UniProtKB/Swiss-Prot annotation:
TM ranges: none
High-level lineage: Bacteria, Pseudomonadati, Pseudomonadota, Alphaproteobacteria, Rickettsiales
Protein name as catalogued: tRNA uridine(34) hydroxylase
UniProt source species: Anaplasma phagocytophilum (strain HZ)
An example Gene Ontology molecular-function term: oxidoreductase activity, acting on paired donors, with incorporation or reduction of molecular oxygen
HAMAP family: TrhO
SUPFAM superfamilies per the UniProt record, alphabetical: Rhodanese/Cell cycle control phosphatase (SSF52821)
Top EC category: oxidoreductase
């Protein structure tokens, strides 16, 4: 079973006002270091966004630790598993935004699109005339996507607003738009931005691709390929297990675990090809 793989990977976010987020950094970092937890936590005045990994007991204790702060209590998170820690360090970063859209003072709290449960997602995206937009970056989409979804071709989420403005030109604002991303946080902002352009029927996949893969299995799934993740697993399969189908972009051969620890934006190169490039 996947749960016997040894390490739990937990991804979560919450938009909530954290006026003291600067002070929270050292407290969270110290707790994680004491419990052998590694990963990345982003703190901003507008909330928290994180993916962490550790042994089961350590992860349970971490969320009990978050419960001590009423703003972060009862945190919902997506869980997957790995045979090794998929992070080499524990980082707690302070940012202006928990996910960078590139528009100063853009408030998504009152405009975000309508959440759609994974069980209802298939019916939504197969409706005639529904526009399905993948809000992730191009290098993520290459690993997998929902069939017939629109790829904005971005290299950074900050490029999404410019793409959306151009895409929206001349379109009927009453059309249906369904949006998705890895864990849901980018869609909180991208759906709100699309609504700010005048679109009314805007939806997004609740909990993102990871939640969908947990909820919709086998022949019922409309997901094709793997799902890129921002850790040393690089991608997970339909069972949210580390993908065994990751190949070198140059020779298409197998890539060792050591080479997966230095992947930049999905550009995977095996050791042999790296050596050939240097020589």
């Amino acid at each position: 079973m996947l749960m016997s793989m040894g390490f739990v990977v937990a991804a979560f976010y919450r938009f909530v006002h954290l006026h003291n987020y600067y002070d929270m950094r050292s407290v969270i970092l110290e707790f994680c270091q004491e419990h052998g937890i590694k990963g990345t936590v982003i703190l901003a005045e507008q909330g928290i966004n994180a993916t962490i990994s550790g042994e089961r007991d350590a992860i349970n204790k971490f969320f009990s630790f978050l419960d001590l702060d009423h703003r972060l209590a009862d945190m919902k998170y997506h869980e997957s598993y790995s045979s090794r820690l998929p992070f080499s360090k524990m980082k707690v970063r302070l940012k202006k935004e928990v996910v960078r859209l590139g528009i100063d003072d853009f408030d998504c709290s009152s405009m975000r699109g309508e959440y759609v449960d994974p069980k209802a997602w298939n019916d939504l995206i197969t409706k005639p005339g529904m526009h399905v937009i993948d809000t992730r970056n191009d290098y993520e989409i290459k690993f997998g996507r929902f069939k017939h979804s629109i790829n904005p071709g971005t290299t950074s989420f900050r490029e999404f607003p410019d793409w959306a403005r151009k895409w929206a030109e001349g379109k009927d604002k009453d059309v249906g738009v369904a949006m998705y991303c890895t864990g849901g946080i980018r869609c909180e902002k991208s759906t709100a931005f699309l609504k700010s352009l005048g679109f009314e029927n805007v939806y997004h996949l609740k909990g993102g691709i990871l939640n969908y893969l947990q909820s919709v299995k086998g022949a019922d799934s409309l997901w094709e390929g793997d799902c890129f993740v921002f850790d040393e697993r690089v991608a997970v399969d339909n069972n949210i297990a580390p993908s065994e189908d990751i190949k070198c972009v140059k020779c298409f051969g197998k890539v060792d675990e050591a080479d997966l620890r230095s992947v930049s934006k999905g550009h995977i190169v095996c050791g042999a090809c790296k050596s050939a490039d240097v020589s």
